[in-house]
A protein has these predicted regions:
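Conserved ABC transporter NBD signature motif
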Residues: 20-27
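Catalytic Walker B motif of ABC-type/P-loop ATPase nucleotide-binding domains
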Residues: 128-131
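H-loop/switch region of ABC-family ATPase nucleotide-binding domains
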Residues: 164-165
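Q-loop/switch helix immediately C-terminal to the Walker
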Residues: 56-68
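ABC ATPase NBD coupling module
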Residues: 28-42, 78
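Helix N-cap at the start of a conserved alpha-helix in ABC-type nucleotide-binding domains
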Residues: 139-141
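Helix-to-loop junction immediately C-terminal to a conserved catalytic motif
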Residues: 12
């Protein structure tokens, strides 16, 4: 009810802002074509099924993300990207590497959310929006996904906007904390 998801929807271009502008490095994102905006802004939803195709394998989902959603070159992408995908998953704590050829619907919630996160970062977006991306996970898995998130965004230097009700995560991982109440900023701490 405070406008958090609405704010993310506006930034990602899912809904049009009623007033004002969405600026990134002084460039108005609202004026960009949808395909260009999706290259700049990526998003991880609370429900990982919104960012993945559950009936496809982990490898196919990653290949689709690398191909920016085009099925056209999927076979070619699968063939040439095999080593890249396996290396990408090396060190992921939820062990996605051994599940490359398993349909996403058979993965745990943490594995699906990790996959969704990795897919969102494959095209090196400038901004990553995280919408309660660990809310549905148990505390241990939530911490693992947060650690993976932190590792990826730091390695790739991605500006991240995380919506969370977990104050511990916000304080520990955030460089800046903004609290909203009824659509207004009531706290802004760096």
């Amino acid at each position: 009810g405070t406008g958090k998801s609405t704010l993310l929807n506006i930034i990602s271009g899912l809904i049009k802002e009623s007033s004002g502008q969405v600026l990134l490095n002084k460039h108005n994102l609202s004026n960009l074509a949808e395909h260009r905006r999706t290259q700049i802004v990526s998003r991880v939803f609370q429900d990982p099924s919104l960012g993945t195709c559950p009936s496809m394998t982990v490898r196919e989902n990653l290949s689709l993300a690398l191909n920016k959603g085009k099925l056209l070159n999927l076979r070619k992408c699968l063939r040439y990207k095999r080593d890249f995908l396996e290396n990408l998953l090396e060190g992921v704590s939820l062990d996605l590497k051994k599940y490359l050829d398993v349909q996403v619907k058979f993965l745990s919630g943490g594995q699906r959310q990790s996959l969704s996160l990795i897919m969102s970062c494959l095209t090196n977006p400038s901004v990553l929006l995280l919408d309660e991306h660990t809310a549905a996970l148990d505390p241990k898995t939530s911490n693992e996904v947060i650690e993976l998130t932190n590792k990826i965004v730091r390695e790739k230097n991605i500006t991240t906007l995380m919506v969370t009700h977990n104050l511990k995560h916000a304080l520990h991982y955030g460089d800046r904390l903004i609290m909203l109440h009824k659509g207004e900023v009531v706290l802004d701490v760096k």
